[in-house]
Amino acid sequence: MKIRSQVGMVLNLDKCIGCHTCSVTCKNVWTGREGMEYAWFNNVETKPGIGYPKNWEDQEEWQGGWVRDVNGKIRPRLGNKMGVITKIFANPVVPQIDDYYEPFTFDYEHLHSAPEGKHIPTARPRSLIDGKRMDKVIWGPNWEELLGGEFEKRARDRNFEAMQKEMYGQFENTFMMYLPRLCEHCLNPSCVATCPSGAIYKREEDGIVLIDQDKCRGWRLCISGCPYKKIYFNWKSGKSEKCIFCYPRIESGQPTVCSETCVGRIRYLGVLLYDADRIEEAASTEREVDLYERQCEVFLDPHDPSVIEEALKQGIPQNVIDAAQRSPVYKMAMDWKLALPLHPEYRTLPMVWYVPPLSPIQSYADAGGLPKSEGVLPAIESLRIPVQYLANMLSAGDTGPVLRALKRMMAMRHYMRSQTVEGVTDTRAIDEVGLSVAQVEEMYRYLAIANYEDRFVIPTSHREMAGDAFAERNGCGFTFGDGCHGSDSKFNLFNSSRIDAINITEVRDKAEGE
């Protein structure tokens, strides 16, 4: 058993209001610079829709994630080692700029400098790539916001598989939900396997997946290998970049920027302990519908004395174990079984999980729109948001985990409403879904009124425990595309200018000499 710790995230889609605050703050902090204008490490999509980039869920087109061969082994869908190498100089399955969008601003200066005329001056869009005026803006990262566009285009959503999607194009049957997306920081990342340069790695102390900007050579095969399309090519520096899970903040015990600024307080951060030796077995599961359960088996119980003893032997700090015991991510994913992984069929074992949305379902039930079942709860198999659609997104098509999560949240609401409105304790609903009173009350506290310290349980890092302190001292932090400036490498495949670090000692000596 090889015990490792991972900082995971849960997003409660039941509370997401689609305000895009997480996207804007992430953009301002990490990608508001030349070469990354089109990149959104965090974006919020309206579902159903084809998303950003276009049709990112269609792995037959983009060749992301893993596939299981007949011998029971998994390999990148992009190809084995030789198959990846053959695509170095001509990768046919990398998204083009039109699959994202041409980033633009507006000619605001014209509003001030326009000469006097008969008509009010307008701010025309200008491309942020070549600076030229654009005749028409035709796509964007949130183009499908609030079901924008005709249903014919949104119907290409891959989550409509095994469904009669035509009926959902009718006004009375339409539905929508928000889906915030960021890098999944997977346990079995396919981007790591498809990088020919070995530039992508997963940190042992917190599981964050990063790209070494000095090793990256801009082959862009990682973009194809990532099934979530959350790696972006910086055309200015010639490097690939991705969400870094705000690791400088995580190391000091602070939440990510997107979590800190979330208006709806839908995000939870916490530590999970897992057995790294079980990853290959879990990812190689034969049936895709079993992948969710197999991934859950990878996680370890942080309250188990034998797990604690072994974790301490393997160098897991005590504060990490304590944080894992209080982790809201473990509670939602393992204890209550509310959170589910995004597209587990990609076999990457993602670590950003989602609580399926219930609010539109509950309001529909209150209006008497759902048939009653034999128990207290309505028959939520026939809901406004189709359960099969959520299952295709969160559990590889298996409706069981989705129904369990939705029923438990509805039972929690029934129980709390009976207490606050009727003044009685009605446990029939929670008994029906297999929850105790203590579990439901704790669920309510975390989902409805959780404090800051409840939602974000992040242990500080221990740099003093590094096996090689010299390498840690010389390692660089996040850089904006130029690598660790002071390296010896002068070769640049893309012939872009390199910004070398300023030698402070030489500058000071020169100043003193003058």
Curated annotation (Swiss-Prot):
The keyword Iron applies. [4Fe-4S] cluster 1 binds at C16, C19, C22, C262. [4Fe-4S] cluster 3 binds at C183, C186, C191, C226. Coiled coil: none annotated. It is a peripheral membrane protein. One of its GO terms (molecular function) is iron-sulfur cluster binding. Binds 3 [4Fe-4S] clusters per subunit. Binds 1 [3Fe-4S] cluster per subunit. One of its GO terms (cellular component) is nitrate reductase complex. This is a second nitrate reductase enzyme which can substitute for the NRA enzyme and allows E.coli to use nitrate as an electron acceptor during anaerobic growth. The beta chain is an electron transfer unit containing four cysteine clusters involved in the formation of iron-sulfur centers. Electrons are transferred from the gamma chain to the molybdenum cofactor of the alpha subunit. This is Respiratory nitrate reductase 2 beta chain. The lineage of its organism: Bacteria, Pseudomonadati, Pseudomonadota, Gammaproteobacteria, Enterobacterales.
